[in-house]
Amino acid sequence: MNDTLRMKKWWMLMLLLTVVGINDSLAQAAPAAAERDVTPKYSNEFLNIGVGARALGMSLAQVATVRDVTSGFWNPAGLTGINSDLQIAGMHSEYFAGIAKYDYAAIGKSIDSVSAASISFIRFGVDDIPNTTELIDAGGNIDYDRITTFSAVDYAFIFSYGRKGFPFGQGRAATSSAGSGDAFRWGVNAKVVYRHVGDFAKAWGFGLDAGAQYDYKKWHFGAMAKDITSTFNAWSYTLDERTKEVFTTTGNEIPVNSLEVTLPRIILGAGREFNIKKITLLAEVNALMTTDGRRNVLVSANPVSIDPGLGLEASYNKVIFLRMGVGNFQRVKNFDGSDAMTFQPNIGLGLRIKNLQLDYALSDIGNVSDVLYSNVFSLKLDIVRSDRK
């Protein structure tokens, strides 16, 4: 059995597992959804914002060409691109004029010549939210001193493993970023999600991802199946009698323990490298396919919608980087009732000094889309043992 046949069988297996996972998830969600909507759109959406200023500058087009510790988020197959003993990355960004804060940190390690692993941490939170349930005292008087604050925070821990070669048989595990042959890589994620809203509500969730990458000369191909078996978030609520009374008086529904299901999404990508002396040009296009029903994206259908993204990167001697991208195509309705298509253009810069890389991205330049612009900075550090330098 040659490598090409193994590769085809592996891609077919990934596709089959994804389809089976989607069908099984929809089948499990349907009975419960008849009583309560347990498969809402944008479930665990904080896990789809993206990590790394490089990726954000390229409009999230990463699944085929990512090769560093951020692969634990984008495609665990790319972890095999870690060449140092340890690689550490971090990012901080703020949204909605600083109201929401997004933090990311990851550490990855090359296990041997064909495998690598990483641990990633993500926090997305809104802090200091006023709690006005006790604003009015027993005498009916407004007392602002009774206002307290709480936080609504989402956490995720992602444990990733990537490996070169085909899972079935030895296959060919040679790297080929410079066109020296073809290479296949695969990877898996196990993620734990914890979300809480003050002391009132909390949820635990668990999910699995699977990804693969394949290089042919200067072409790169990738596939990522997120929440391949669906991610189940078990919500529990703790409300005291006073809070329940306030909810009833103000016409709010008292929440009950429930199960929220995050349905699978598939990302397909293709990229191409162009080398001109010390200048390297990289272009990648991704197609994000969601399975949670019709969305207002470029290709809108039920249950699968497709949102494309395009990213470009130019580098000089792998030291200075200039990036741009376009994505987040949205169908929006104007005030006059007409429909319009918006998109989000991004740009980015990068600078590598020895083992340290600093990246910057500016999203939604020119305020073209309905999304507010954001400035994003990220760092990446390679740690190499002194005996290997």
Q: What feature does the model see in each segment?
A:
Residues 11-12, 75:
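Short linear interaction motif-like sites in intrinsically disordered regions of transcription factors
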Residues 22-27:
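Sec/Tat signal peptide C-region and signal peptidase I cleavage site
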Residues 28-389:
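Subset of outer-membrane beta-barrel
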Residues 7-10, 324:
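Hydrophobic alpha-helical segments, especially transmembrane helices
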Residues 1-7:
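N-terminal secretory signal peptides that target proteins for export/translocation
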Residues 12-21:
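Bacterial N-terminal signal peptides
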